[in-house]
Amino acid sequence: MKTPVFAFALLVAAAHADPRRSGFDDMSASTQALQRDDTLNPALLWLKDGEQRFTSLCVRCHQPQAMRGVATRYPAFDSRLKRPVTLGERINLCRTRYLESKAWGAENEEWLGLETFVANASRGLPLAPPADQRLAPFREQGRQLFVQRLGQLDFSCAQCHDQNAGGRLAGSLIPQAHPTGYPIYRLEWQGLGSLQRRLRNCMAGVRAEPFAYGSAEFVALELYLMQRAAGMAIETPAVRP
């Protein structure tokens, strides 16, 4: 028989349970199985390619084991640019600054693979956005974008993913939209894609003109979304419908 103290502790724990849900929690068992089993995960090809690319390009400066935890703290402030940069942009900056190579373009397969490898090193770790005060105005910009109505349908991110999360839109479940698994493999895409690709899809869905890849708006929005998901575990490479 449970003691009153133990029962009270259970009630307190339930009251403080994290209401946030990963998109993984809402997927079918078959799609969850694809993500759980690395040998079945369709993003494996990109992950392996990223590992090879890291070995050939990055080990002169970085050891693979040092990548553990890196993805948990992006976007981060770049002192030279005086603005936040995403993990993908940091990789591209390393490419141009130190390898003196041409920057990869949006959704480049090699770039996605390398970012997947770096982010995968932090799989299972909680997102830990930096407390750097220089990020505060950019994060606030992202919050404002999240609640701003856009497009001909006059919808905001918050309307779908805060107010109506768990409901359905055109037959599809509306997720809470926590960016815990990017780059992700979407079955709809039959390929790997970045968070910005997904955000552009959402904007097109409400009939708004999508921001450009790499835009300040997308970086600010990602900064806010990562703060919103702080403490949730990284899943990269996640699989979604």
Task: Indicate residue ranges for each PLM-predicted region.
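C-terminal cap of thioredoxin/glutaredoxin-like
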Residues: 151, 159-165, 177-187, 193, ...
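The canonical Cys-X-X-Cys-His
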Residues: 55-65, 114, 142, 152-164, ...
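Post-cleavage N-terminal segment of exported redox proteins
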Residues: 2-5, 12-46, 75-140, 166, ...
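Short acidic alpha-helical/loop segments enriched in Asp/Glu that coordinate divalent cations
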Residues: 128-131, 155-158, 170-174
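N-terminal, post-signal-peptide region of Sec/Tat-exported proteins
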Residues: 38-65
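Short, flexible, mixed-charge glycine/proline-rich loop motifs
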Residues: 50-52, 147-151
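Short Cys/His-rich "knuckle" micro-motifs
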Residues: 68-71, 167-170
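Short cysteine/histidine-rich metal-coordination sites, predominantly Zn2+-binding motifs
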Residues: 74-81, 173-181
